[in-house]
């Protein structure tokens, strides 16, 4: 039996921990060393009182047969131990429970793990421990009389601090016994040890460039501010002042811009008819909002004294997929350069010389493009870089069993196969690849790139424009060859798209052509389309039959006690604790990515999706989710992050949540944390900051068909039984709409009507007109919310439809408030005189009465936001009140470290969660399998970015990009038939090839 030594350090440093462990360690001191041998009592060595290490601790650390167990020991404790005490524990003797937890889809925080495994943990003590760490492990505030708290200045707190250190050992020891070890096999353990070597090695950084770039940005911002003032006659002080700039452009040039998005500005700049002064002003605005100063600042504060940046990747940091997550510098989210490599190289030299303005017109663009160039090769070495080619596309075809495509990849790699783009067209049109013309190949290229992740017409349109494909010529060339049946289906979809205003401005001919090509591409990939549904079926079977493995092509799914495991071909598993089926939905326990609470989640199997047409905020502006491409940058509410693009998840049942169609289990960020879309009616969306220069798009107001009897009730605003009627008495009236439930309720006293409407209804305007001229009345608003009038006025206003309206109060969760939109509002459309919905009364002195007075709004600009709100304590929040329906649904893959992105809703920007991807996990295993051989061959890995390896190697011909690519694309025994290819280059400064 393995002997264990459980260890934990408490440290002090005047360098903040957010600068990274290695920078923190340069000034670190060890305060306490807590330890326990196997199940022996915990001991605490107070290093501040006695510098001599206890004899038993020294013996344990010197014994090579004893395994030391730490929580975050790899990335923190052992680094400090080596730096401060010069004790270099071999990584083979280090076990990290944090990494073990992450590898199995569990949170890394020790406190959360205690909650999950029901380990006895005193919450009050844990809270006190954090306060003690803040007091004793960090410098005191500058205005404090005591600059550092110690055992001498805070003796009582110090003793409690020692007790707290011992309690962490007890918790860690219990957690170690509970954690599964499926994913900590020999290969994964060796891979983690290599990961620690890479993190400790770090990468050489051009600190001079980072400092020069920050200086250049600061100077350029001042210059742009001066230019803005000159161009606007001091009406606008800085081009980053969006509202002031929009107002000035409208007044000075008579041009109203819908927003300040980069795509909007670029279109205007390219317009030859705009005045030169406006063109210059818009260019200044673009430059002012393009920079990456935060990355440069993170680099400078975290780089070690020797010029290397360390500790930038967390092993298994990406939940469940096992991919690495960025830390400190976040190298996975470096902006894609917009300048060519030669321009960047010259610009870097100019930045370092302090004269970038002499060769570059846009300093901000240069500094953003030069950010990757901060990673350099040290003297005598070069950077050798290689990237797996289209690994996720290959992996998807291989996992799904799309054999014809797997063979096509393999033959193409061997130089024997047909061009993949010709093959894509030929496969769709049932032609021979050699018969595909140059023009048809271009169509095939757009099909492969635009539809590879399930994109539709909009994706096809985006890639067609990107590759200069003339859509009229496309329609002329392709339409005659499209089978009639496919064409008929495309025509039906076009007619539906016209009704929903989602034709993207395309003519019928072009739309039908693009949609037909989409259908033909999907018909050519039947295994890929069915793959996700087969996985879901296997998961449901496994949950219902514990201990039995269910095969799903190259995957297997099984339930071991409370754990659901999707076993990848590599032998690693994607782990889902406490998986079960609830109302047909697959659920499991997981960490809420926002609140960090452990709770039941409903995201699995491609079901968490958004309806086609949902607008996603990308760095180029708002874009329908189906056309978001691989390597695009999306806003996650905090920063721009890279995504692997959208994935089509079939036709699924969607509901309306916050005015957007999505599956009921899709995760949305509310004021109370992450909730499923089906719960959205009970919560307001979380506030979300949009990046400077980006504005919520305008939503077209449509008529609202309520599809059921409308109940119109009135109530008065008072706080007692006795109502004193005075001239100041105000009455509020709400339009109430029952939510579709199955409750059997009494017949309401409201007449059924066939879509009567309030016409010309506008908020903040005193008049509105009924469908009946003789009943036109004036209505007044109660402040910014509600309708101020009496029941009789509403009866008169509604003419013959309002005679049976009672005047009592109702409150029920099944009813919905309806804030009146600025255009037409249909009151109802029913098919029968009976109703499913009941009413109930509430006394005027109800303590809950005032909670529902008026119609509250989180946004004063009522004319821009038509909402259906739930009436929970009077708060406004668009709900899932609309009936369910079937729609094409999509999700985004791998959206940065927070796994989320921002979409547009009528209520404002909304943060949603992105889907997990089995292909990512399997692709990660390909990269991981080949990392140890690459390291052994002399290519010292300094960084991995998605499917790319950056290594340092001697500057000799022996080490080449071809050699590295060959090692990276080597097939493992578990993926011997997976076609792999890698390409790379050699450089002295990192760049995007």
From Swiss-Prot:
A molecular function GO annotation: DNA binding
GO biological process assignments: DNA-templated DNA replication; double-strand break repair; intein-mediated protein splicing; viral DNA genome replication
Keyword annotations of the record: DNA replication, DNA-directed DNA polymerase, Hydrolase, Nucleotidyltransferase, Transferase, Viral DNA replication
Enzyme Commission no: 2.7.7.7, 3.1.11.-
Keyword Transit peptide applies: no
Keyword Thylakoid recorded: no
One Pfam family named in its UniProt record: DNA_pol_A
Catalysed conversion reaction: DNA(n) + a 2'-deoxyribonucleoside 5'-triphosphate = DNA(n+1) + diphosphate
SMART domains tied to this protein: POLAc (SM00482)
Superkingdom per UniProt: Viruses
Family: Belongs to the DNA polymerase type-A family.
Function field: Replicates viral genomic DNA. This polymerase possesses two enzymatic activities: DNA synthesis (polymerase) and an exonucleolytic activity that degrades single-stranded DNA in the 3'-5' direction.
The protein's name: Probable DNA polymerase
Annotated organism of origin: Acyrthosiphon pisum secondary endosymbiont phage 1
């Amino acid at each position: 039996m393995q002997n264990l030594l459980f260890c934990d350090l408490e440290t002090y440093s005047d360098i903040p921990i957010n600068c990274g462990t290695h920078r923190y360690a340069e000034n670190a001191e060890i305060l306490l060393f807590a330890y326990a041998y196997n199940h022996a009592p915990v001991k605490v060595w107070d290093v501040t009182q006695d510098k001599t290490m206890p004899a038993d601790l020294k013996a344990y650390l010197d014994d090579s047969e004893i395994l030391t167990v730490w929580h975050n020991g790899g990335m923190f404790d052992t680094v400090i131990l080596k730096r401060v005490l010069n004790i270099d524990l071999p990584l083979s003797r280090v076990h990290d429970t944090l990494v073990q937890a992450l590898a199995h889809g569990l949170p890394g925080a020790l406190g959360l793990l205690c909650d999950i495994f029901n380990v006895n943990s005193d919450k009050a003590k844990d809270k006190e421990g954090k306060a003690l760490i803040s007091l004793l492990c960090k410098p005191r505030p500058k205005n404090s009389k005591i600059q550092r708290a110690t055992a001498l200045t805070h003796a009582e707190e110090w003793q409690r601090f020692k007790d707290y250190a011992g309690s962490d050992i007890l918790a860690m020891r219990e957690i170690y016994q509970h954690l599964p070890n499926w994913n900590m096999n020999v290969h994964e353990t060796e891979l983690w040890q290599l990961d620690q070597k890479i993190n400790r090695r770090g990468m050489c950084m051009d600190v001079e460039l980072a400092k020069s770039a920050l200086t250049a940005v600061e100077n350029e911002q001042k210059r742009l501010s001066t230019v803005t003032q000159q161009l606007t006659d001091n009406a606008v002080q800085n081009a980053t002042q969006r509202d002031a700039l929009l107002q000035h452009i409208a007044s000075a040039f008579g041009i109203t811009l819908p927003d300040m998005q980069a795509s909007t500005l670029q279109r205007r700049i390219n317009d030859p008819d705009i005045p030169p002064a406006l063109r210059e002003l818009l260019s200044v605005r673009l430059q002012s909002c393009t920079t990456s100063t935060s990355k440069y600042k993170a680099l400078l504060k975290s780089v070690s004294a020797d010029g290397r940046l360390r500790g930038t990747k967390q092993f298994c940091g990406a939940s469940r997929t096992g991919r690495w997550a960025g830390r400190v510098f976040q190298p996975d989210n470096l902006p894609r350069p917009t300048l060519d490599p030669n321009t960047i190289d010259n610009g870097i030299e100019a930045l370092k010389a302090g004269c970038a303005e002499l060769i570059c017109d846009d300093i901000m663009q240069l500094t953003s493009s030069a950010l990757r160039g901060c990673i350099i090769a040290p003297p005598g070495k070069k950077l050798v870089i290689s990237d797996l080619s289209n690994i996720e596309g290959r992996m998807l075809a291989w996992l799904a069993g799309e054999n014809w495509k797997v063979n096509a990849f393999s033959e193409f790699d061997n130089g024997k196969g047909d061009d993949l783009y010709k093959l894509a067209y030929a496969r769709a049109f049932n032609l021979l690849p050699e018969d595909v013309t140059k023009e048809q190949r271009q169509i095939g290229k757009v099909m492969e790139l635009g539809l590879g992740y399930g994109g539709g017409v909009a994706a096809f349109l985006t890639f067609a424009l990107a590759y200069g494909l003339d859509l009229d010529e496309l329609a002329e060339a392709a339409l005659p060859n499209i089978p009639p049946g496919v064409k008929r289906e495309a025509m039906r979809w076009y007619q539906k798209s016209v009704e929903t205003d989602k034709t993207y401005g395309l003519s019928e001919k072009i739309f039908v052509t693009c949609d037909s090509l989409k259908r033909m591409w999907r018909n050519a990939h039947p295994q890929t389309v069915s793959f996700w549904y087969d996985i879901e079926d296997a998961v449901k079977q496994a949950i219902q039959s514990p201990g039995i493995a269910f095969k799903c092509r190259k995957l297997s799914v099984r339930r071991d006690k409370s754990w659901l495991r999707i076993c990848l071909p590599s032998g690693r598993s994607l782990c889902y604790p406490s998986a079960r089926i609830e109302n047909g939905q697959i659920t499991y326990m997981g960490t809420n990515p926002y609140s960090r609470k452990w709770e039941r989640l409903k995201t699995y199997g491609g079901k968490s999706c958004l309806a086609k047409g949902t607008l996603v905020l990308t760095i180029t502006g708002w874009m329908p989710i189906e056309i978001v491409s691989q390597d695009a940058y999306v806003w996650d509410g905090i920063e721009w992050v890279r995504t692997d693009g959208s994935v089509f998840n079939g036709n699924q049942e969607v509901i309306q949540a916050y005015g957007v169609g999505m599956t009921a289990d899709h995760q949305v960020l509310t004021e109370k944390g992450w909730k499923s879309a089906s719960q959205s009616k009970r919560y307001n969306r979380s506030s979300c900051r949009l990046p400077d220069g980006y504005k919520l798009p305008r939503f077209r107001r449509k008529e609202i068909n309520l599809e059921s009897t409308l109940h119109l009730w009135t109530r008065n605003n008072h706080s007692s039984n006795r109502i004193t009627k005075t001239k100041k008495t105000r009455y509020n009236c709400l339009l109430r709409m029952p939510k579709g439930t199955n409750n059997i309720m009494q017949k309401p006293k409201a007449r059924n009507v066939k879509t009567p409407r309030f016409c010309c209804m506008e908020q903040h305007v005193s008049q509105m007109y009924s469908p009946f001229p003789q009943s036109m009345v004036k209505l007044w608003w109660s402040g910014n919310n509600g309708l101020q009038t009496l029941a009789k006025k509403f009866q008169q206003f509604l003419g013959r439809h309002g005679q049976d309206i009672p005047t009592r109060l109702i409150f029920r969760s099944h009813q919905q408030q309806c804030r009146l939109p600025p255009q037409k509002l249909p009151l109802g459309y029913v098919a029968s005189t009976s109703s499913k919905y009941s009413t109930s009364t509430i006394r005027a002195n109800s303590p809950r009465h005032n909670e529902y007075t008026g119609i509250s709004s989180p946004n004063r600009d009522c004319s821009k936001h038509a909402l259906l709100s739930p009436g929970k304590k009077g708060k406004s929040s668009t709900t899932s009140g609309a009936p369910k329906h079937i729609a094409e649904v999509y999700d985004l893959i791998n959206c940065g470290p927070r796994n989320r992105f921002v979409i547009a809703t009528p209520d404002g920007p909304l943060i949603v969660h992105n889907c997990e991807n089995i292909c990512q996990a399997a692709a990660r295993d390909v990269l991981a399998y080949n990392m140890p051989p690459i390291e052994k061959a002399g290519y010292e890995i300094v960084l991995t970015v998605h499917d790319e390896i950056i290594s340092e190697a001697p500057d000799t011909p022996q080490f080449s990009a071809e050699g590295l690519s060959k090692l990276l694309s080597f097939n493992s025994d578990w993926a011997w038939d997976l076609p792999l290819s890698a390409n790379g280059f050699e450089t002295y400064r990192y760049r995007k090839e």
